[in-house]
Amino acid sequence: MAVTKDQTSQIVKKFKTSDLDTGSSEVQIALLTAKINDLTNHFAKHKKDHHGRRGLVTMVNKRRKLLDYLHRKDVKKYQDLIKALDIRK
């Protein structure tokens, strides 16, 4: 199942940097992570969904680019976000 509006609004509230923030790198990365986790669970059941897997790879690449950007701009925010989302081991 896709990420719902309620889940999206909760993620935005948790990771926003200002009151009107919906598009900062942190928020975008958190939303992509939620979608990636959701699709990963989907592929555990639907192994042959190759069209969906292509979308997953696209999301992972976009998240990687945003993480690289955040790492270049602010290492502290990058490290905090990685810990909060539990992305890196």
UniProtKB/Swiss-Prot annotation:
This is Small ribosomal subunit protein uS15. Keywords: Ribonucleoprotein, Ribosomal protein, RNA-binding, rRNA-binding. Belongs to the universal ribosomal protein uS15 family. The keyword Iron-sulfur does not apply. Part of the 30S ribosomal subunit. Forms a bridge to the 50S subunit in the 70S ribosome, contacting the 23S rRNA. CDD domains: Ribosomal_S15p_S13e. It comes from Bdellovibrio bacteriovorus (strain ATCC 15356 / DSM 50701 / NCIMB 9529 / HD100). One of its GO terms (biological process) is translation. One of the primary rRNA binding proteins, it binds directly to 16S rRNA where it helps nucleate assembly of the platform of the 30S subunit by binding and bridging several RNA helices of the 16S rRNA. One of its GO terms (molecular function) is rRNA binding.
